[in-house]
Amino acid sequence: MVRLVCSRILKFPKPYLWSATQTTSRCFNSRAQSHNLITKTITSSLQDVLTRPIWQNRSFVQCRRVSSYAQMVNNHQSVTIETFDALCKQVKIREALEVIDILEDKGYIVDFPRLLGLAKLCGEVEALEEARVVHDCITPLDARSYHTVIEMYSGCRSTDDALNVFNEMPKRNSETWGTMIRCLAKNGEGERAIDMFTRFIEEGNKPDKEIFKAVFFACVSIGDINEGLLHFESMYRDYGMVLSMEDYVNVIEMLAACGHLDEALDFVERMTVEPSVEMWETLMNLCWVQGYLELGDRFAELIKKLDASRMSKESNAGLVAAKASDSAMEKLKELRYCQMIRDDPKKRMHEFRAGDTSHLGTVSAFRSLKVQMLDIGFVPATRVCFVTVEEEEKEEQLLFRSNKLAFAHAIINSEARRPLTVLQNMRTCIDGHNTFKMISLITGRALIQRDKKKYHFYKNGVCSCKDYW
């Protein structure tokens, strides 16, 4: 029976081979048995027609994944859809996938919105292997569900997978193109993002403001303000768009994020409309991130006069940690995003907070790294420290920032030369950025940092963002 089914698979047209392997896995009690027989039956010359490699087949992933959660649950009757929801809230993605298997065995199919929610979680915690399994569970029904899958792969740093989904879409709208452009720019591929916009225009599409916003973000990733300003001019010159305050804010953010604060202020002075609170808020945050505290404080005073409530809400979201007065949603984001580090093949997560001294070995390791950094000319950017204390104490406070502790912990608890990844819930400051460039040079490691805005890839003392963030 087994060999008969396998022989029939070979007669299927090429587009159906992938579906056939998935269907066959349900014909046997042992998924491992079905995978082994299919692998032996399908010749190597036919393997290239599969839309994904055979090892990504969901049945095979199920074979090699230890069902730890299923082993804990002796009675599968106690596993319900509420179990799945609870695991998703706890960001336990692998366990949630195991529950999907259990529910399917009981004849219950997890609904589409829940699967899309799980896809978003995969992108948030950068779980690429699990993301591919979730993708196998999803059959996108509309453009929005395709966008969710693209954003999932973007969060997992797999732009190739995202592009595959994009190219497979039967129909794309402007939001689709904007999503793909942001995906490439966020992952440090600004040139490809600009090329994607060029392709968008060449195919006869008309851009909207959201597309241009994505293009500005791509220009920041390559540090090309001239390209961005040309696109800004084309908005009203070539496409007749009526500019809003949000459009001006986007340009200001592009200029300031590229380090051109003088040009940003000149742009504000030349504007024909009165600057909004949002514009001053953008300048304030970017000044603080880049270490221009005095100028940022001036903008802060101006914001307080115009709208004091802005200073206690989302105005500081990109710079300071969430406050006690923030909403429950912000607390949930903090739970998911707060300084997590993967340091082993099992993808365990470790959380670090500023001032955390519970990992004595971590602090000691970073002090040792700091000595080596100072020897080759590193100068701590103490101007980003807001507390009015002596210079030495500022350096000490910078030492205990959560992202530095996370990298130090990973260095001493992982194999030599292995790339390291840190996720954080705030934008990185200039001191942290310079620190990680030096660490990548000293240790010979590739460091990957995802902050609130984008990815940073550090290698041999250089960052992929070219110091524009």
UniProtKB/Swiss-Prot annotation:
Q: Which GO terms describe its molecular function?
A: RNA binding; zinc ion binding
Q: Which InterPro entries match?
A: DYW_dom (IPR032867), Pentatricopeptide_rpt (IPR002885), PPR_At4g14850-like_plant (IPR046960), TPR-like_helical_dom_sf (IPR011990)
Report the domain of life of the source organism: Eukaryota
GO annotations of cellular component type: mitochondrion
The primary location reported for this protein is: mitochondrion
Q: Name one GO biological process term.
A: RNA modification
Keywords carried by this UniProt record: Mitochondrion, Repeat, Transit peptide
Q: Where are the PPR repeats?
A: 142-172, 173-207, 208-238, 244-274
Q: Where in the cell is it found?
A: Mitochondrion
Q: Where is this region: Type DYW motif?
A: 375-469
Instruction: Please list the residues that make up the transit peptide in this record.
Output: 1-65
Record Gene3D superfamilies: Tetratricopeptide repeat domain
Family classification: Belongs to the PPR family. PCMP-H subfamily.
Supply the name of the protein.
Answer: Pentatricopeptide repeat-containing protein At2g34370, mitochondrial
